[in-house]
């Protein structure tokens, strides 16, 4: 009788776990996915957007953070098989562009717009071949700054390189426009982080407004915990994981 009861309980627990239907999510991106600035800013790890999502979806979805700081779509393509396809998730968040758009030498971005588009399409098409549902995300706005006091974007990148392009903020958003276009053309759900951040700063899209919003840290291109909450809310409001 005792053995029968134990067997019954084991079967009950197993059936319950199967019924809950655990699903996997991979968050694939750069430092704003990884939360690379959390350590040196001393932000609470629980307030990274991926971790907020993990907490909210605990018991429903297992979520893997596959963000690596400093990476472009070209870098990410090299690890797409191991970090995404081999994980066999149901959903895939894709957030790149900040490093692709960076101009380091000779006035050229790290990844051209054409190649950036090709890489996004590759991620989407390969995901779908493996039964994975891709979700695109735009990158956050840039606080340009004036290059002084080791603050904001122009303290690390040359403002002159971005002047012909209308400034770093406009240039970065032009990569987001590619993400938006790919989302529309390939019918991929989109979390428009850029749009949500600008709405949260009052719709002004200026350095002053973005600084006052508290959404972006002193680097000028990394989010704060307050910004991470905006990303999470964009996912939840769009019911992205229920589609």
Curated annotation (Swiss-Prot):
What topology does it adopt in the membrane? Answer: Lipid-anchor
Identify the stretch annotated as signal peptide in this record.
1-16
Q: Where is the lipid attached (N-palmitoyl cysteine)?
A: 17
Which locations, inside or outside the cell, does it occupy?
Cell membrane
Asked if the Swiss-Prot or TrEMBL record annotates the protein with the keyword ATP-binding, the reply is no
Lipid-modified sites (S-diacylglycerol cysteine): 17
- Please list the GO terms describing molecular function: hydrolase activity, acting on ester bonds
**Superkingdom of origin:** Bacteria
An annotated GO cellular component of this protein is:
plasma membrane
Which UniProt key words apply to this protein? Cell membrane, Lipoprotein, Membrane, Palmitate, Signal
| Name of a matching Pfam family | Lipase_GDSL
Q: Please identify the protein, giving its name as recorded.
A: Uncharacterized lipoprotein YqeF
Q: Which organism is it from?
A: Bacillus subtilis (strain 168)
